[in-house]
Amino acid sequence: MSDVLLVLNAGSSSIKFALYEAHTEPTADHLICEGGIGSLGHRPHFKVVNSDGSTRYDTYLPEGTSHDDAMAVLIGWIETTFPEHRLSAVGHRVVHGGALFDGPVDVTPEVIAQLRAFDRLAPLHQPHNVSAIEALAKLHPSLPQIACFDTAFHHRLPEVATAFALPRELTEQGVRRYGFHGLSYEYIAGRLPDVAGQAVADGRVVVAHLGAGASMCAMLRCRSIATTMGFTALDGLMMGSRCGELDPGVVLYLLEEKSMTAREIEDLLYRESGLLGVSGISDDMRTLLASDDPHACEAIELFVYRIARELGSLAAALGGLDALVFTGGIGEHASEIRRRVCEQAAWLGVTLDPDANASLSGAGRISAPDSKVSAWAIPTDEDLMIARHVWRLADGGR
């Protein structure tokens, strides 16, 4: 009986998973299958695809299926479908680790209690990340679970890059910049030498993780030195339904002049803003790019503008720029967004190769051969990054 590792990413209405062979440190070739249970709270859809993309399992679960029920269904399906394998450990994507965790950690009751303290700092993700851990602990109390944090990659940011201009006592209480999407940035940092060469990896690189959630990270020698997200995953770039950077005075105005409650403002900023709020149409970039509605065009223009502005800021933090990397769902697949960003980055030395950008599939260079700053698109794989952390911490890696 061979060991397998399970990677879980639990959200408000879904549980996504990936299953890997665990006889050696996982690579993409060790993926057995992946999928998830979506539309929880409505008509849950359970779909699994094999590593080659073919459908392995596709069904609907009863309406009213809870997150805990869905977890039991998923684990039961894995154990029934793969009797020749032993589930040896589970890795969870956990968005916020605060200042407590600088790397993956074995989950204990004490760790769970510490993670619960961050629920209000990442309301779209953290409560559901931790609930999945708790549900699985009830199902399999002896199964090792490992929490892998989106904040950990930024744990050693320079102090000046983490500080807000607030009274020192608040800073000492943990009100500071943490940064997110760290599992994605960690994966890209590991891929850079192979895709772009060691010289690029050792240089001044800005990585743009563009998806429903979006952020950017300035890397020097593949280490984070500045990032756009802050105390929460609400800060920085405009996102699918999140506002990104916002004058705090707007929040005070909404509280005092519009008599909105804190929860109403949270819903507005996290769930009703960004591409969705500006366009009034959708939080999906594909839908907006296909639309001729002027509000869709305005949303796209603002999205690109914010990226271009933050790129200049991060280049300043690096003292220059050697390479720009796109990743995430939009960064990997939306060549039009890459084109617009690169055109606005021409002053930094980015010269796009239009044909390479339009035809790229997978990882590769999209800038012209004579571009002073090279530009790349590299697919990310947060699940694989988590699987590697789990393997290293669990029995197979010891």
UniProtKB/Swiss-Prot annotation:
Subcellular location: Cytoplasm
Pfam families linked to this entry: Acetate_kinase
Entry's cofactor comment: Mg(2+). Can also accept Mn(2+).
Catalytic reaction equation(s): acetate + ATP = acetyl phosphate + ADP
EC number: 2.7.2.1
Cofactor: Mg(2+); Mn(2+)
Pathway this chain belongs to: Metabolic intermediate biosynthesis; acetyl-CoA biosynthesis; acetyl-CoA from acetate: step 1/2
Active-site feature positions: 150 (proton donor/acceptor)
Chief subcellular location: cytoplasm
Entry keyword ATP-binding: yes
List of residues binding Mg(2+): 9, 382
Chain positions of site Transition state stabilizer: 181, 242
Gene Ontology molecular functions: acetate kinase activity; ATP binding; magnesium ion binding
Protein residues bound to substrate: 93
InterPro entries: Ac/propionate_kinase (IPR004372), Aliphatic_acid_kin_short-chain (IPR000890), Aliphatic_acid_kinase_CS (IPR023865), ATPase_NBD (IPR043129)
Binding site for ATP: 16, 209-213, 284-286, 329-333
Gene Ontology cellular-component annotations: cytosol
Subunit comment: Homodimer.
Family (UniProt): Belongs to the acetokinase family.
Protein name listed in UniProt: Acetate kinase
Species for this entry: Rhodopseudomonas palustris (strain ATCC BAA-98 / CGA009)
Taxonomic classification: Bacteria, Pseudomonadati, Pseudomonadota, Alphaproteobacteria, Hyphomicrobiales
Annotated gene: ackA
